């Protein structure tokens, strides 16, 4: 069994305590990762702080060269990393390899986008007469140490979406991968290390949340926190962060609104793809369908047909539905299913579970008193909610505590735009499934779904400070 190590100040280091990582597929032991202590976390933070001045002093072109090398290494090793990723988080092997390739593309784009983040010169004369002799040079400077905390569901891509923009902007990074997904995260770190990233610029921290979780968030050396995960943890990070800037990508209860004039066959295909990709373990998964009563029967039948085509089983067979991340997650999802059954939702698909493998469930006649109408399952469960009007559909969608994304299916462009304006979410997809990306697009949530705007350009800007240097020219 492989004993993985943390990258700290350019060296691979073990810890006295370790965490064994098991595959959600079959409980195979995949290896161990270090369980760092607070003292070891301090050492990593100190290394990052010491490395900051030299890294910040490099030109964007010099920093970009390291990112381009890293991207090339990821593409070279995509099969190896993708195989580990598939085992570690039970993701289909094709999708796992695709995640590594997408990550290489993201890192390249970040390297190039960093070259386009330039300053500006401003004259003061346009404001008041007394300021006509003033000239400002406005620059963007790195914030310092960025703490990047990634989720299990995209342990390579959503890690790099934080790391690459931070690095190209001149920041140094403390990377905390998810426990389940930490091996994949450390393989990403290995690519940066092989690319020659200077010692201390990129460091990793693995360990138990009870030991180092709050500690690294509150750490005095951290200047910016970039987190993807659950809303309760995100809210806690917000409280612990104090006055420091944060970027939070949190939960969602993304709704697909289906209007009477929609192409129902197209809508059904998009909804099922959006709901059940990676077994629904995506913050951007469609998690409820809100449909006009007049077309609900037909849509329900079409959705049932599409769900019946999904395959269930092993990620290495590229099954559509694979085991969820752990038994605790499966138990939570199962609780939502049982609650819906007890309250007389109509199951349109067989309900079956084997350990942490759940068959896809489609419920019709879901009402407001059912938990599945409101809670994020993070699993293969999709409720259909029938409404009498577009206004009711919008109100139901907006009643959620979350505000990540929505889809609207209609052939009326004007109506689609009007609805999009009224939905309290960060992104609205018209006649398409909810999804993250392309990675250069802005990605954000409102309400309980997050804080700050991601997307490569937006992430770079978020992880920099604006400095204005003002001259009196006469």
Which residues make up each language-model segment?
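Residue-level signal for inorganic ion chemistry
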Residues: 27, 63, 85, 107, ...
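Short, well-ordered beta-strand elements within core beta-sheets of diverse protein domains
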Residues: 30-36, 51-57, 147-148, 256-259, ...
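Rossmann-like NAD(P) dinucleotide-binding subdomain of oxidoreductase/dehydrogenase enzymes
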Residues: 75, 124-266, 387
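ALDH superfamily catalytic-core signature
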Residues: 232-367, 430
């Amino acid at each position: 069994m492989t004993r993985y190590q943390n990258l700290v100040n350019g060296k691979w280091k073990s810890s006295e305590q370790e965490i064994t990582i098991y595959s959600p597929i079959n409980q195979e032991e995949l290896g161990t990762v270090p369980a760092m202590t607070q003292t070891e976390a301090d050492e990593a933070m100190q290394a990052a702080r010491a490395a900051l001045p030299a890294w910040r002093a490099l030109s964007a072109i010099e920093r970009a060269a390291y990112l381009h090398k890293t991207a090339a290494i990821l593409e070279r090793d995509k099969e190896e990393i993708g195989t580990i990723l598939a085992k570690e988080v039970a993701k289909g092997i094709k999708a796992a390899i695709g995640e590594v390739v997408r990550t290489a593309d993201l890192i390249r784009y970040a390297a190039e986008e960093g070259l386009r983040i330039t300053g500006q010169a401003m004259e003061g004369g346009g404001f008041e007469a007394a300021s006509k002799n003033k000239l400002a040079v406005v620059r963007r400077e790195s914030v310092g140490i960025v703490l990047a905390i990634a989720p299990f569901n995209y342990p390579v891509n959503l890690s790099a979406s934080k790391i690459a923009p931070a690095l190209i902007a001149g920041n140094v990074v403390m990377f905390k991968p998810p426990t389940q997904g930490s091996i994949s995260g450390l393989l990403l770190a290995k690519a940066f290390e092989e690319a020659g990233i200077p010692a201390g610029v990129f460091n990793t921290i693995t360990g138990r949340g009870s030991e180092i979780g709050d500690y690294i968030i509150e750490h005095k050396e951290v200047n910016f926190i970039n987190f993807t995960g659950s809303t309760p943890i995100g809210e806690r990070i917000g409280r612990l962060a104090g006055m420091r800037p944060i970027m939070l990508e949190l939960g969602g209860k993304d709704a697909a609104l289906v209007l009477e004039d929609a192409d129902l066959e197209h809508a059904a295909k998009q909804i099922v793809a959006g709901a059940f990709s990676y077994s629904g373990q995506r913050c951007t998964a469609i998690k409820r369908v809100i449909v006009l009563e007049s077309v609900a029967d037909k849509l329900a039948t079409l959705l049932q047909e599409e769900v019946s085509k999904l395959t269930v089983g092993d990620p290495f067979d590229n099954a559509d539905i694979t085991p969820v991340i752990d038994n605790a997650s499966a138990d939570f999802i199962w609780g939502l299913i049982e609650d819906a059954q007890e309250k007389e939702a109509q199951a349109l698909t067989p309900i079956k579970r084997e350990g942490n493998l759940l068959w896809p469930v489609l419920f019709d006649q879901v009402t407001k008193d059912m938990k599945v109408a409101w809670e994020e399952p993070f699993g293969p469960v999709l409720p259909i909610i029938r409404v009498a009007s577009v206004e009711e559909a919008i109100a139901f969608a907006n009643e959620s505590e979350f505000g990540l994304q929505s889809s609207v299916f209609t052939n009326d462009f004007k109506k689609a735009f009007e609805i999009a304006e009224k939905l309290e979410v960060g992104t609205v997809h018209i006649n398409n499934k909810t999804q993250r990306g392309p990675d250069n697009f802005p990605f954000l949530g409102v309400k309980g779904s997050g804080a700050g705007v991601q997307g490569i350009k937006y992430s770079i800007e978020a992880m920099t400070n604006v400095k204005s240097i003002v001259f009196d020219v006469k």
